[in-house]
């Protein structure tokens, strides 16, 4: 799927704290200044998650989020520098300042908003079951996952959702997507939970050997994730999103 298609589809307790908050914007450097000084936006993504970010036949990173990140960087007057990182370490890399932002279908959740700032959503999708074609009719609702071997990304919202909603499922976690898809294809697991948009892409890429099973179980919105304390960068990203979409 192309970029064009997807783009459619406290009170403070003391005066000293109050004064501190008022003067902070004057003295605190914002990450946006550093990004513009360096000329690059360090972007974290997996690089193995089609159609959002993956390597083409020549080994070049491509996909919707690659195009989006390049457009965002251009709006900021810099270039995007991509840092492929496994999902289970990508937010830690953001926290440790190895990355400026993460653009990797990071679902905006209340729990994550306690730790990170998010842009407005750039995709709206859902949690989707993906099975082998012959088994598609066996999964129509969340309760159908009970007792089945369900593959999910380690530390993802899919894993959390499954634990909360279908604890009877046999949860198998993966730190990379290719292995997860391969295990489904050869029958080591019964079903995987993925982004609904990614599910349709995978069906196409596998020559319809896999199938989207039922409707999405839950709505999810994804946004650009960045460290808290960078209001100028956050505002610039939000403004760029308005122009891009």
Question: What are these model-derived regions, one by one?
Answer:
Residues 7-11:
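N-terminal export leaders
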Residues 29-105:
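Extracytoplasmic small-molecule ligand-binding "clamshell" domains
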Residues 41-42, 78-79, 96-104, 148-149, ...:
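Alpha-to-beta junction loops
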Residues 53-57, 69-78, 142, 155-174, ...:
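Ligand-binding cleft/hinge of the Venus flytrap
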Residues 66, 82-92, 137, 172-186, ...:
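Short helix-initiation/N-cap motifs at beta->coil->alpha
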Residues 89, 106-114, 161-164, 185-218:
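A ligand-binding cleft/hinge motif common to bilobed small-molecule-binding domains
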Residues 124-131, 196-242:
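Periplasmic-binding protein-like
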Residues 132-149:
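Flexible hinge/capping segments at coil-to-helix
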């Amino acid at each position: 799927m192309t970029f064009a298609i997807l783009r459619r589809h406290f009170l403070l307790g003391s005066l000293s704290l109050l004064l501190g908050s008022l003067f902070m914007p004057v003295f605190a450097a914002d990450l946006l200044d550093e990004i513009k000084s360096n000329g690059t936006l360090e972007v974290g993504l997996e690089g193995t998650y089609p159609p959002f970010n993956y390597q083409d036949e020549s080994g070049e990173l491509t996909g919707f989020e690659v195009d989006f990140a390049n457009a965002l960087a251009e709006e900021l007057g810099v270039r995007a520098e991509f840092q492929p990182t496994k999902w289970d370490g990508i937010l830690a890399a953001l926290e440790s300042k190895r990355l400026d932002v993460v653009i990797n279908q990071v679902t905006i959740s209340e729990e994550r908003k306690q730790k990170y700032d998010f842009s407005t959503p750039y995709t709206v999708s859902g949690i989707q079951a993906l099975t082998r074609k012959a088994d598609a009719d066996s999964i129509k609702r969340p309760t159908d996952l009970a007792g089945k071997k369900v593959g999910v990304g380690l530390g993802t919202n899919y894993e959390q959702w499954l634990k909360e909603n279908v604890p009877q499922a046999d949860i198998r976690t993966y730190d990379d997507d290719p292995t997860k898809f391969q295990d489904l294809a050869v029958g080591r697991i019964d079903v995987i939970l993925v982004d609904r948009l990614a599910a349709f892409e995978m069906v196409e890429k596998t020559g319809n050997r896999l199938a989207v099973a039922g409707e999405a179980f839950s709505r999810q919105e994804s946004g650009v994730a960045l460290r808290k304390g960078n209001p100028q960068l956050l505002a610039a990203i939000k403004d760029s999103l308005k122009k891009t979409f």
